[in-house]
Swiss-Prot record:
GO terms for MF: glycosyltransferase activity
Protein family (similarity comment): Belongs to the glycosyltransferase group 1 family. Glycosyltransferase 4 subfamily.
Top enzyme category: transferase
Pfam families: Glyco_trans_4_4 (PF13579), Glycos_transf_1 (PF00534)
Official protein name in the record: Putative glycosyltransferase EpsF
Keyword Transferase: yes
InterPro entries: Glyco_trans_1 (IPR001296), Glyco_trans_4-like_N (IPR028098), Glycosyltransferase_grp1 (IPR050194)
Induction text: Repressed by SinR.
The enzyme's E.C. designation: 2.4.-.-
Biological process, per Gene Ontology: polysaccharide biosynthetic process
Entry keyword set: Exopolysaccharide synthesis, Glycosyltransferase, Transferase
Coiled-coil residue spans: none
Amino acid sequence: MNSSQKRVLHVLSGMNRGGAETMVMNLYRKMDKSKVQFDFLTYRNDPCAYDEEILSLGGRLFYVPSIGQSNPLTFVRNVRNAIKENGPFSAVHAHTDFQTGFIALAARLAGVPVRVCHSHNTSWKTGFNWKDRLQLLVFRRLILANATALCACGEDAGRFLFGQSNMERERVHLLPNGIDLELFAPNGQAADEEKAARGIAADRLIIGHVARFHEVKNHAFLLKLAAHLKERGIRFQLVLAGDGPLCGEIEEEARQQNLLSDVLFLGTEERIHELMRTFDVFVMPSLYEGLPVVLVEAQASGLPCIISDSITEKVDAGLGLVTRLSLSEPISVWAETIARAAAAGRPKREFIKETLAQLGYDAQQNVGALLNVYNISTEKDHNR
């Protein structure tokens, strides 16, 4: 490490291809690493999707057991020790929602001057009850007592974790989930090649979905949709990219419903921008979300997106690509909406890029905003 280089420690559950992880990596790739370097503290000591890239970019990876694997006091002590042993750090940036207050406390005890708590979700579970709300208030007090800066991917996520009053006081930095807009720009000429490389059908309606296999992503609803389309005789293929604890269960359910010839399980996909070119429409029926990076990526790719109204309307970039539907709507309404959207015209490439950049979804532009949060000044941040 050179003497002028600043190091920032990001804390996440694991560096797989989730929304928060992808957002951080998009910023990391654009950062001038001769001046600012990222390191990562995670709760997983098994290999994750982004590990090799992090190491190749000069970052380091550290591990501590999660708060659920230990207890709050032990967790804070472990995080503090990891910070002190591997620092100094100019900032610690925590992305683990309600746990961020414990991380900010550990960073304060370790003497880190800038401690950032970042909200990426509008809830952390389904069936949010009064006990959960009381717990959230306790976590919020811990965050506000120890963080020097608050960030959120959108207003709803900021309001959920930090409270309405802090949003009104403009204490929360809104940092949209920026991406590489040029990388995701539509390229229809490459679609056939990308389909062939992944075993995706060349002559069917391709319905795409990219997410980890967790309850909140509602993969069971996608299988219900697939069964309905099959009953109607629609020639389609549902392409599911991602991995996670429910993957085996969902695949078995697809087998039991005789859907394996119509549903393709791709596993973890490294080149999402290429995969997007193979889709005719993107579907996301999540039970709740913050502001998903993948929906920004889908719109940047020119894809019509049919999403649940549990996802914030602020994800709609105004390109005419997003349709929000209630999960209580008949499955036939979803199917008809998908068919219409897939057949509709698409906005032009330059219009997409300009619109998303104006909304703050250009990762290159967001680098400067993030450095301001860290109180780090650099002349230029154009290293790729």
